Curated annotation (Swiss-Prot):
Gene Ontology CC annotations of this record: centrosome; endosome
Primary location class: other
Keyword field contains Glycosyltransferase: no
Location within or outside the cell: Endosome; Cytoplasm, Cytoskeleton, Microtubule organizing center, Centrosome
Family the entry assigns: Belongs to the CCDC22 family.
One Pfam family linked to the record: CCDC22_CC
Function: May be involved in regulation of NF-kappa-B signaling. May be involved in copper-dependent atp7a trafficking between the trans-Golgi network and vesicles in the cell periphery.
Residues in coiled coil: 243-269, 326-367, 400-540, 584-628
Protein name: Coiled-coil domain-containing protein 22
GO MF annotations in UniProt: cullin family protein binding
C-alpha cells in the first residue's frame, strides 16, 4: 500500500493539492486535506462540477455537513459505485478514502489536459506555453497606468493589439519542380521582395501568413478527399483528372456566358454589357473566329488603328508624366491644358470606336444572314441538279427501251444472285464474328473485373499508406512531445533507482505468487490425502464389521468385540468431527481478527469521539441560534 499511497499523493500534488512533504500515506490525511484533495480532483475532471465547491472546510458544523453531502453527490455523478456520504469525508476511514482517491485518480485526464494517445506535438507545447503565459499575466494584479512598471505596461496595454487583416502574398514555390519556368525562378531569386516588404503594414504579416497557410492546407485536404472519392474511380492520372476537370469547368463557364449574351441580346440591354460579354466569349474561343474571318482589309485596319491608338496615347501620357521633371507653375498649366485636350481627343476616338463597333455588329449580322441564304440556295441548286441528272439519264435510255429493259433485268438478276452469295458469306462471317465477339466480350469482362479488383486493391493500399503516414506522423509528434517533456524533467532524479524499485516490486510479486501456488498445491495434496484416509477407514470398518458380525452370532466374546468396534468407530467419528470443528473455529477466529484489524484502521473510536464533539458543537450552535431568536 505504500507504493499506491505514494502514487496517489503524487497525482494529488499534480492536481494542485498542497500535500505536506512529511505525509507519505493516506493514513496521515486529515479531514481538511481530504476535502481539498477531492475538490481539486473534481475541478480537474469536470470544471463545471467542481467550480461551485470550496476546497476549504468551513468552521460551522452545518456548513461542513452540506459540503460533505455535495462532495458525495458529485462523486456519485462521476460514476462512483461504492457507498459514499458526508460521513466518508467528515469521519473518514483509510480504506474508503483510498478507494475514493483511486477512483478520482483514474478519472483524471492524462498529462493534466490531454490523452496520451492523442498527442499534438509542437501545437500542444505551444498551447501549454500560451496557457502558462496567460495564467501568469492573469495572476498579476491590475494597476493604474501611472503605477505600472515597464513589464506591466507591455503586458497590460492594448497598444499592441491589431485587427486580423490579411492580404495576398507572393511567395516562391519549390525550386526543384520541373514545371516552373527558369524565368520565374530567376524572378524569385533576384527580384521577388520579402514578405514584410510586400505589405504596407507590418502587423498584417502574421495574419496574411496564417491565411495563406490555412488556404493551402484546406486546398490539399479537399484535393485528397476528392481524389479518394472520385479520382481513383475515374482511372485517370492526377494530371489528366485535373485537365478534365478544368475543361468541364471551362465549358460550364462558356455556357453561362453564352446564355447571358443571349439574354442581353433578347432584352436589348445597353451595348456595353453585350460588348463585354462578347469580348469574354472571344477570350474563351466561343465565337469561332467569325469576326476575324469576316470583314475587309480596310475594316480590320481601321479596327486595329482605333482600338490601339487610345491605349498607346494613355501609355505615352503616363510615361511623360513619370519622366518629365517638375517645372514651374506656367509649364504645369500648359501641360494640364495639353492633357485635357488629349483626353478630349481620346474620348471622341472612343466614341467613334463604339459607333464603329455597333455598325460592325450590324454588318456581321447582315453577313451572317446573307451567308445563310447563300447556303440554302446552294443546297436547293444541288437537289435540283440531282433530279435533272436522273431525268436526263432516263431520257437517254428511252429510244432503245426493250434492250435496256433486258439489260436492266439481267443486271437485277445478277445483283440478286450476288446479293444471295453475299448473304451466305455474311452469315458464315457473322457466325464466326459473333463467336469472336462473344469471346472478346468475355475477355473484356474478365479484364474489367480484374481492373476493378486491382483498382480496389490500389484504393485499399492507398488508404493503408495514408493511415501508415498518419500513424508515423502521430508517433513522430508523440516522440517529439515525450522528448521535450523528458528534457524539461529535472535531471537530478535517478532513473536507475526507479528501475531498481520496479524490479524489486516485480520480484516480490513473483515470490508471493510462488508462495501462494505452493500453499495451494500443499492444500490440494493434504485434502487428497485426507479423502484417501477417510475412504480407507470407511472401507476397513465395513469389511471388519461384516467379518465380526458373522462370528458374533455364534460366539459371545466376539459379540463383545463387535460392540467395542462400534463404540471405537463412533468415538473416532466424533474425534474427526471435533478436529474439523476446531479448524472451522480457528478460521473464524482469524476472520474475526482481520475484521478487528479492519475496524481498528477505520478509527471507529476516534470517529465516535469526533461525532460526540460535533454533536456538542451542533447543540451549542442551536442554543446560540435560539438565544438570538428570542432576543430578536
Amino acid at each position: 500500500m505504500e507504493e499506491v499511497d505514494r502514487i496517489l499523493i503524487h497525482s494529488l500534488r499534480s492536481c494542485g493539492t498542497e500535500v505536506p512533504e512529511d505525509i507519505q500515506s493516506i493514513r496521515q490525511f486529515n479531514t481538511e486535506l481530504i476535502v481539498e484533495a477531492v475538490v481539486r480532483c473534481l475541478r480537474v475532471i469536470n470544471p463545471s462540477l467542481g467550480a461551485t465547491l470550496s476546497h476549504v472546510l468551513p468552521p460551522g458544523m452545518s456548513a461542513q455537513f452540506r459540503i460533505g453531502t455535495s462532495l458525495a453527490q458529485a462523486c456519485q455523478d462521476l460514476g462512483y459505485s461504492s457507498e459514499v456520504g458526508y460521513q466518508t469525508f467528515l469521519y473518514s476511514s483509510e480504506p474508503d478514502i483510498r478507494a475514493l482517491l483511486i477512483f478520482l485518480a483514474e478519472k483524471l485526464p492524462r498529462d493534466s489536459s490531454e490523452d496520451a494517445h492523442q498527442p499534438a506535438g509542437k501545437s500542444a507545447l505551444l498551447q501549454r506555453e500560451i496557457v502558462a503565459t496567460i495564467k501568469q499575466q492573469l495572476s498579476l494584479p491590475w494597476l493604474p497606468l501611472s503605477c505600472r512598471i515597464a513589464a506591466l505596461r507591455r503586458s497590460q496595454s492594448s497598444c499592441r493589439l491589431h485587427r486580423f487583416h490579411s492580404q495576398p502574398l507572393s511567395l516562391a514555390s519549390d525550386p526543384a519542380l520541373k514545371s516552373i519556368p527558369n524565368e520565374r525562378k530567376e524572378y524569385w531569386q533576384r527580384y521577388l521582395p520579402s514578405v514584410t516588404s510586400q505589405l504596407p503594414h507590418l502587423p498584417s504579416v502574421a495574419a496574411s501568413l496564417l491565411e495563406r497557410n490555412t488556404s493551402k492546407l484546406s486546398a490539399v485536404q479537399e484535393w485528397e478527399a476528392e481524389w479518394k472519392s472520385q479520382g481513383l474511380a475515374s482511372r485517370l492520372s492526377p494530371e489528366d483528372y485535373r485537365s478534365k476537370k478544368q475543361q468541364r469547368l471551362q465549358k460550364r463557364i462558356q455556357e453561362q456566358l453564352r446564355q447571358c449574351a443571349q439574354l442581353l441580346a433578347e432584352n436589348h440591354l445597353p451595348s456595353s454589357s453585350s460588348q463585354d460579354l462578347t469580348d469574354m466569349l472571344r477570350a474563351f474561343n466561343l465565337d469561332g473566329g467569325s469576326d476575324q474571318k469576316k470583314g475587309s482589309r480596310f475594316t480590320r485596319t481601321q479596327r486595329f488603328t482605333y482600338q490601339q491608338d487610345p491605349h498607346t496615347l494613355k501609355e505615352q501620357m503616363q510615361r511623360a508624366a513619370e519622366i518629365l521633371p517638375k517645372k514651374d507653375a506656367q509649364d504645369a498649366d500648359a501641360e494640364q491644358q495639353e492633357i485635357s485636350s488629349l483626353q478630349e481627343q481620346i474620348d471622341s476616338i472612343e466614341q467613334e470606336i463604339r459607333g464603329l463597333s455597333e455598325s460592325n455588329k450590324l454588318l456581321q449580322l447582315t453577313i451572317g444572314q446573307v451567308e445563310g441564304e447563300v447556303n440554302d440556295m446552294h443546297q436547293s441548286c444541288e437537289e435540283k441538279a440531282n433530279v435533272v441528272r436522273v431525268k436526263k439519264r432516263a431520257v437517254e435510255l428511252l429510244p432503245d427501251a426493250d434492250n435496256n429493259l433486258d439489260k436492266l433485268q439481267t443486271l437485277v438478276d445478277a445483283s440478286a444472285q450476288r446479293m444471295a452469295n453475299l448473304i451466305g458469306q455474311w452469315e458464315s462471317h457473322q457466325a464466326r464474328l459473333s463467336d469472336e465477339y462473344m469471346e472478346l466480350n468475355r475477355v473484356q469482362q474478365e479484364q474489367e473485373d480484374e481492373s476493378s479488383r486491382w483498382m480496389k486493391d490500389a484504393k485499399d493500399l492507398y488508404e493503408k499508406i495514408q493511415g501508415s503516414a498518419d500513424e508515423a506522423k502521430r508517433k513522430e509528434e508523440l516522440y517529439k512531445q515525450l522528448l521535450s517533456e523528458y528534457e524539461s524533467l529535472p535531471k537530478e532524479v535517478s532513473r536507475a533507482a526507479y528501475t531498481q524499485r520496479i524490479l524489486e516490486i516485480v520480484s516480490n510479486i513473483k515470490k508471493q505468487k510462488e508462495e501462494i501456488t505452493k500453499i495451494l498445491s500443499d492444500t490440494k495434496e493434504l485434502q487428497k490425502e485426507i479423502n484417501n484416509l477417510t475412504g480407507k477407514v470407511d472401507r476397513t470398518f465395513v469389511v471388519t464389521d461384516e467379518l465380526v458380525f458373522k462370528d458374533a452370532k455364534k460366539d459371545e466374546p466376539v459379540r463383545k468385540a463387535y460392540k467395542y468396534l462400534a463404540a471405537l468407530h463412533e468415538n473416532c467419528s466424533q474425534l474427526i468431527q471435533t478436529i474439523e470443528d476446531t479448524g472451522t473455529i480457528l478460521r473464524e477466529i482469524r476472520d474475526l481478527e482481520e475484521q478487528i484489524e479492519t475496524e481498528t484502521t477505520k478509527k471507529t473510536l476516534s470517529n465516535l469521539q469526533k461525532i460526540l464533539e460535533d454533536y456538542r458543537a451542533i447543540k451549542q450552535e442551536n442554543a446560540q441560534l435560539l438565544a438570538r431568536t428570542r432576543e430578536a
